[in-house]
Amino acid sequence: MQNQQIRIRLKAFDHRLIDQSTQEIVETAKRTGAQVRGPIPLPTRKERFTVLVSPHVNKDARDQYEIRTHKRVLDIVQPTDKTVDALMKLDLAAGVEVQISLG
């Protein structure tokens, strides 16, 4: 595992949840002796929806909704076996999607 690099991508709708999960991952990796690059905030995706409020006429009556998807990237350089084990056992928040890739 010495020449490997672990890239962790996090996605969430709530920025506080993603920051908390990122902090937990960074603390776990540093505690096990790995070097961490990041967290790097990626651009937030804003998805907007416009809904007609009126069931029949009145095109002027509309509501607009927005969903923001926050993203972060972490690189763990030169992870040890302890680092991988600790990351596998880590329990993160339910609203955070985690993608892990080795490279």
UniProtKB/Swiss-Prot annotation:
GO terms for molecular function: structural constituent of ribosome; tRNA binding. GO terms for biological process: translation. GO terms for cellular component: ribonucleoprotein complex; ribosome. It holds the Pfam family Ribosomal_S10. Keywords: Ribonucleoprotein, Ribosomal protein. SMART domains: Ribosomal_S10. InterPro entries: Ribosomal_uS10 (IPR001848), Ribosomal_uS10_CS (IPR018268), Ribosomal_uS10_dom (IPR027486), Ribosomal_uS10_dom_sf (IPR036838). Part of the 30S ribosomal subunit. Belongs to the universal ribosomal protein uS10 family. HAMAP family: Ribosomal_uS10 (MF_00508). Involved in the binding of tRNA to the ribosomes. This is Small ribosomal subunit protein uS10. It comes from Stutzerimonas stutzeri (strain A1501) (Pseudomonas stutzeri).
